[in-house]
Amino acid sequence: MNNQTKVTTVGLSVKDLVTTGIFTALFFVFTLVGGIFFAPNPVLTFYMPIGSALLCGPIYLLMVAKVQKRWSVTILGILMGIIMFAAGMHWAYSLGFILMGIIADLVAGLGQYRSKKVNIISYMLLCLGGTGSYLVFFADPGSWAKTMLGNGTEQGYIDTMQETGNTWILTIMIVGTLAAAAASAFAGYKMLKKQFEKAGITA
């Protein structure tokens, strides 16, 4: 009995894995919903991380509150990376989610997954994962275009991005993503206040 309790407390139980899987699926759906207005348009696509960050806060924070263990957020980041790569996104988008998922997990762990402020910061960092593809776009547009052409993106779409993608957009994208993530997280805590109090989430 003691060994079972230790495993459940330290590692992820089957229930934790199922919970993580369910919330990852929801996170993926809301990421798509948040970005669907921006992604199809080569001029607005740079703002897709902002739209996605605006919707996923409550989902992320509720998952953290229900599991409250290391690796859950990491798994979310890895699964998001795999799914997005399979869907034809640039490899840097997937890598961004994986890396920021690990970092977000470590940050949330600093507050034992129970600190409201730390969890919000954790979510903000995770959302930066969605900017990975665009970072490569600005750093190496030629290589980015070659990869996306191989993934099936139309040349006209890429040309429009390169014509309209001024460097100042990168600043707006990063700052906007952080701001949208913070707003989404605060709204999530307001909407689900009772659930978070029950889970022992503190200020």
Task: Map each language-model feature to its residues.
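Aromatic-anchored segments of alpha-helical transmembrane domains
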Residues: 24-32, 79-87, 125-135
